[in-house]
Amino acid sequence: MAGINKVIIVGHLGNDPEIRTMPNGDAVANISVATSESWNDRNTGERREVTEWHRIVFYRRQAEICGEYLRKGSQVYVEGRLKTRKWQDQNGQDRYTTEIQGDVMQMLGGRNQNAGGYGNDMGGAPQSSYQARQTNNGNSYQSSRPAPQQAAPQAEPPMDGFDDDIPF
């Protein structure tokens, strides 16, 4: 049976994306996303919080989108998988790092927030949203920008014959 390697992160960028271009011309974006969890300490009753930083890498079109739209403080939803890379440092020592290879990225929050400002996010539907998906082979992309939807005003049906007496 095959294993599952899937990561889902929702957090805020700690810095602007770092964008590089590989020798073959493909873009690479590195982002650092913070997630936090908080709890009340049983012994002291104090509110405690710990922040975890996640290094996420995007390639090709997704990397370009990151560089164009994401800024420090932007809230983002990421799906991806853990990857471990090996390289040699200046002394010839083998070094390893584990990072998330992003497959799906969706910007959350309002337009001002994704531009680096502090938008007024009241917890409703995002004002600005962009989702990009990358297949496992990295060659096919599907991106969509949902159109804003507003409900058309509906006329209420007439209340003729409505009895407003409560039966109890």
Swiss-Prot record:
Keyword DNA-binding on entry: yes
SS bond partners: none
GO molecular function, one term: single-stranded DNA binding
Pfam families cross-referenced by the UniProt entry: SSB
Motif Important for interaction with partner proteins boundaries: 163-168
Keyword line: DNA damage, DNA recombination, DNA repair, DNA replication, DNA-binding
Compositional bias segments (type: Polar residues): 126-145
Gene Ontology biological-process entries: DNA recombination; DNA repair; DNA replication
Biased amino acid composition, Low complexity: 146-158
InterPro entries: NA-bd_OB-fold (IPR012340), Primosome_PriB/ssb (IPR000424), ssDNA-bd (IPR011344)
Protein's job: Plays an important role in DNA replication, recombination and repair. Binds to ssDNA and to an array of partner proteins to recruit them to their sites of action during DNA metabolism.
HAMAP family according to UniProt: SSB
UniProt-listed PANTHER family: SINGLE-STRANDED DNA-BINDING PROTEIN
The protein's name: Single-stranded DNA-binding protein
Organism: Haemophilus influenzae (strain ATCC 51907 / DSM 11121 / KW20 / Rd)
Organism taxonomic ancestry: Bacteria, Pseudomonadati, Pseudomonadota, Gammaproteobacteria, Pasteurellales
